Amino acid sequence: PSDSSKIWRKFSYGALMDVFMIDMYTKKDIDLITPSAYHILGQEQDFWLKNELSNSPARWKIVGNQKMIAGWSVVGLPAWFPGDGTYLTTSSWDGWDEARDALLLYLKNNNIHNVVFMSGDSHVTLVADLSDDPYDVGNYSGSSGAGSIACEFLPTSMTRGNFDEMG
């Protein structure tokens, strides 16, 4: 973007890849579960990202993502956890599940392939297939990856401990 107050941007590496750096902090609305009127990226950045992904001729489309986009649902959490015990945290895309679902559905409906989210700030190492409904075995297969819309990589923590190192 031409406005220097907007930190989201794209870096192109020829036909190999486009890297899209997004900003999840300056435009997001308050943390709510399923907030119909809210968006984690803000409308302008959401439009920009979808437009850039649609028009990218690169083989790989890498999205630099500050927080985990895969759902992190944990069975048996106390009801005082976000979403009445459904989510471990709402500071990730879990707090804006409608925005996440809309982005994944956009990728799927527009046949945008080879999208990789590189995420951070979760203090775990994780690789995930991203599906519009990972619990629907007719739509997604965890063993083969069939039905995956994109994938996500979270590297280990760089300067702080992971969950297994806290105590």
Please annotate each region the language model reported.
Residues 1-167:
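Metal-dependent phosphoester/phosphodiester hydrolase catalytic core
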